[in-house]
Amino acid sequence: MTEVTSSDFCIAIYREDDVWEAQALPVAVTESLDAVIGALRQLPSIGVVIGLIAVGDDFFVIARIVGSQVSLFVSDLTASVDWPLAREVLEHLDIDVPYDEDLDQVLPAGDLSILADLGIDEMELCALSGDLDLFPDEVLASLARRIGFGPAFDRAVDEATGQ
């Protein structure tokens, strides 16, 4: 089992009555992809549910649930060498875990258009994922602001991290 840190969180985003809602999920759900998907499916939204998961200072995952369909994005596939959640995302996507010699760069993987209908295109998502000056929580906060649920996201992160 990988150590959970204070910078780990899983925030569920969904719309209710045309208002973005954000809910902190127990950080324990980040221990497996099945737990993340199961927790997101329990939410009351009749539309899309988005999970924004930060794992330490290393990487983030975006999970999007629409009915029975699951779309996934991981900010750095090389995280799969050390982190079970990233490895499970790659397995779900049918992408091989990289070899050690492939670990010299940040490589996003998955559905690059996962947020395109919300105003974040593939190029922007890749650029933010590859920005080595930003931590995963900062990238997710930036995405939340751009999409329009920044304040709700910030409150949920504060709740999740005990701030």
Whereabouts are the PLM-identified features?
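Actinobacteria-biased recognition of intrinsically disordered, low-complexity terminal regions
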Residues: 1-12, 158-163
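Compact, well-ordered interaction domains used in eukaryotic information-processing assemblies
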Residues: 2-5, 18-19, 24-82
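Glutamate identity and glutamate-enriched acidic tracts
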Residues: 3, 16, 21-23, 31, ...
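Phenylalanine-focused residue identity feature
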Residues: 9, 59-60, 73, 135, ...
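Generic structural hydrophobic/aromatic packing signal, biased to beta-strands
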Residues: 10-12, 52, 89
